[in-house]
From Swiss-Prot:
Keywords attached to this entry: Acetylation, Lipid metabolism, Metal-binding, Mitochondrion, Oxidoreductase, Potassium, Transit peptide
Cofactors: thiamine diphosphate
Catalytic activity as recorded in UniProt: N(6)-[(R)-lipoyl]-L-lysyl-[protein] + 3-methyl-2-oxobutanoate + H(+) = N(6)-[(R)-S(8)-2-methylpropanoyldihydrolipoyl]-L-lysyl-[protein] + CO2
Subunit record text: Heterotetramer of 2 alpha/BCKDHA and 2 beta chains/BCKDHB that forms the branched-chain alpha-keto acid decarboxylase (E1) component of the BCKD complex. The branched-chain alpha-ketoacid dehydrogenase is a large complex composed of three major building blocks E1, E2 and E3. It is organized around E2, a 24-meric cubic core composed of DBT, to which are associated 6 to 12 copies of E1, and approximately 6 copies of the dehydrogenase E3, a DLD dimer.
Entry protein name: 2-oxoisovalerate dehydrogenase subunit beta, mitochondrial
Length: 392
């Protein structure tokens, strides 16, 4: 009883700390005030710090898909889900709190529009959410499951790796759950700490039978998500949550598709190939501009977009041209997907390399809270690695 009383007292103290304290279960989820967070307890004299480590660079307005509308990334996701529910009467969306719109508001308004039988809440049980989605998909319906944070996808690991990914193979294609798509907010957010900032894509890159996708912008998010939902394989769609409100650009209102497993060369160059996905794409775009301005170095920038299966041909073709490769991601260095890219390029392009391949990634530590600015692979770390490659 003493332990229970002590725990209750601890909770009350946290609650008394207010909305900016650790009382919030969803630490780091409240983005409505933007990415400028107070240094908190120092009153009016408190300094404010900019935690966003990048500048979002919108793509040119698309003209081939009809009418466009200004959307941020979460609105683009909502638009894709709306299009899917309207087009496919079997499509259902489910997960923790999705009925009222979700933590990040990605499903707001969909329950009112399509009804509680098609957009509904589930218990807080990630293994159950994915298992339920597999069952729905096996019947031929379209299942769109939401895991509230990518950090909490691990309880569902067995269902994804041993069930969803292998269902078609173990039945000789008599049964499949290819109409399952799992959405999840992903990556650092500026103040998410240990359990709301992780980038677990590499865990699933070792799992044949599924596809893993990470967009960099609202336009990319809608097109790639629609492609995942319509794909014949189970897909995991990781959404960079720091971009939910920070990324704004023109997005087509009508549905459209962006091919999976096809990287995009955002900027052509001749001296160095820079590869990233998600938020980190905007970091390396800044690095490319710095390299051109300060060093006179021409960088080719590639957004990988699909982690599994990834576009080997586009990356290797670029490295054969430039002779140098830098890969960057937020996840820890050891065992990160940059290692797979580096290994493949080493095998395919060895005689073309002018310098060792460089990986600029997160540290091999749990994701820190107040030290997040030191943890993330920002433009200065990437620029330093690029300069060393050029001088090799």
């Amino acid at each position: 009883m003493a332990a229970v009383a002590a725990f209750a007292g601890w909770l009350l103290r946290l609650r008394a700390a207010g909305a900016d304290g650790p009382w919030r279960r969803l630490c780091g989820a409240g983005l409505s005030r933007g990415f400028l967070q107070s240094a908190s307890a120092y009153g009016a004299a408190a300094q404010r710090r900019q935690v966003a480590h990048f500048t979002f660079q919108p793509d040119p307005e698309p003209v081939e898909y009809g009418q466009t509308q200004k959307m941020n990334l979460f609105q683009a996701v909502t638009s894709a889900l709306d299009n899917s529910l309207a087009k496919d009467p079997t499509a259902v969306i489910f997960g923790e709190d999705v009925a009222f719109g979700g933590v990040f508001r990605c499903t707001v308004g969909l329950r009112d529009k399509y009804g509680k039988d098609r957009v509904f809440n589930t218990p807080l049980c990630e293994q159950g959410i994915v298992g339920f989605g597999i069952g729905i998909a096996v019947t031929g319906a379209t299942a769109i499951a939401e895991i509230q944070f990518a950090d909490y996808i691990f309880p569902a690991f067995d269902q994804i790796v041993n069930e969803a990914a292998k269902y078609r193979y173990r039945s000789g294609d008599l049964f499949n759950c290819g109409s399952l798509t799992i959405r999840s907010p992903w990556g650092c957010v500026g103040h998410g700490a240990l359990y709301h900032s992780q980038s677990p894509e590499a865990f699933f890159a070792h799992c044949p039978g599924i596809k893993v996708v990470v967009p960099r912008s609202p336009f990319q998010a809608k097109g790639l998500l629609l492609s995942c939902i319509e794909d014949k394989n189970p897909c995991i769609f990781f959404e960079p949550k720091i971009l939910y409100r920070a990324a704004v650009e023109q997005v087509p209102v009508e549905p459209y598709n962006i091919p999976l497993s096809q990287a995009e060369v955002i900027q052509e160059g001749s001296d160095v190939t820079l590869v990233a996905w998600g938020t980190q794409v905007h970091v390396i775009r800044e690095v490319a501009a710095m390299a051109q301005e300060k060093l006179g170095v021409s960088c080719e920038v590639i957004d990988l977009r699909t982690i599994l299966p990834w576009d080997v041909d586009t990356v290797c073709k670029s490295v054969i041209k430039t002779g140098r490769l830098l890969v960057s991601h937020e996840a820890p260095l050891t065992g990160g997907f940059a290692s797979e890219i580096s290994s493949t390029v080493q095998e395919e392009c060895f005689l073309n390399l002018e310098a060792p391949i460089s990986r600029v990634c997160g540290y091999d530590t749990p994701f820190p809270h107040i030290f997040e600015p030191f943890y993330i692979p920002d433009k200065w770390k990437c620029y330093d690695a690029l300069r060393k490659m050029i001088n090799y």
